[in-house]
Regions:
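Receiver (REC) domain switch-region micro-motif
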Residues: 58-60, 86
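Short, flexible/disordered intra-domain loops and linkers
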Residues: 64-78
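C-terminal output/effector regions of signal-responsive regulators
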Residues: 141-219
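Receiver (REC) domain switch/output surface
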Residues: 119-157
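A short, hydrophobic beta-strand element within the central beta-sheet of small alpha/beta folds
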Residues: 81-105
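Acidic, metal-coordinating helix/loop segments flanking the phosphotransfer/catalytic sites
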Residues: 37-57, 65
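Conserved acidic segment of CheY-like receiver
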Residues: 3-26
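As written
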Residues: 108-120
Length: 219
């Protein structure tokens, strides 16, 4: 069976850091394909690069505007802000911020579990139960599994909606799963509005129509 290679983007303004990260990830070279990028000047442009590249995970340095060797422009955001912005568009997507300034990065990041100290990739993993690159691959696998499970659960709910019907909780869950998959999969098309329409809303609409009808007769 052919091994699946995960595509990982690494963002840093220094070429030396690109080389260091590539050397580090060589330990699991059979499992990943790493592409190093310099940060774009604006966060919107950087996000568009991500959309075009379609990676399985993103690893970014926290400081993206510190060393001006390879880039000559100012980068208006840091790695934590970049990850926060991308995960607003793609909830739970595997993203990681590596830094020497862990306190600043943690205070900026919306999820402290995304922040890792650089020393972990410079000999600081001795004795660790799980190395950083293993955690990256693990998070990718978990994310993909969550998508598969969401698709399966959504299929069951759609079938049940056209059969015995859904409870209010299940109707909310159907909308939640649909939204998650729409943000997670480029190939996914959102469900038609009639499928997501709640029975409670339909009932409310019927009540309003009847009230309007009664008021019209009284008038």
């Amino acid at each position: 069976m052919k091994n699946i290679k995960y595509k990982i983007l690494f963002i840093d303004e220094e070429k030396d850091q690109h080389d260091n990260f590539l050397d580090y990830m060589d330990e699991i070279g059979d499992n990943v394909n790493v592409k190093c990028l310099y940060p774009e000047e604006s966060i919107d442009t950087m996000i568009q690069v991500f959309e075009d590249e379609r990676p399985d995970a993103i690893v970014t340095d926290y400081q993206l505007n510190e060393i001006k060797t390879e880039i000559q422009y100012n980068v208006s955001y840091n790695g934590a802000e970049l990850v926060n912005f991308y995960r607003e568009k793609h909830p739970n997507f595997p993203c990681f911020v590596i830094t020497s300034y862990d306190n600043d990065a943690i205070s900026t990041s919306k999820d402290v579990n995304l922040v890792y100290v650089k020393i972990l990739m410079n000999g600081g993993e001795e004795g660790a139960k799980a190395k950083f690159h293993d955690k990256v691959v693990e998070q990718i696998s978990k994310y993909k599994k969550s998508i598969d499970e969401a698709q399966s659960e959504l299929t069951v709910l759609i079938q049940k909606k056209y059969g015995e019907g859904l409870s209010l909780y299940e109707e909310d869950r159907l909308v939640e799963l649909d939204s998650f998959l729409e943000k997670s999969l480029d190939s996914y098309s959102s469900l038609p509005a009639d499928i997501k329409r709640s029975k409670s809303l339909e009932h409310l609409s019927e009540v309003i129509d009847k009230v309007d009808e009664i008021l019209a007769k009284l008038g």
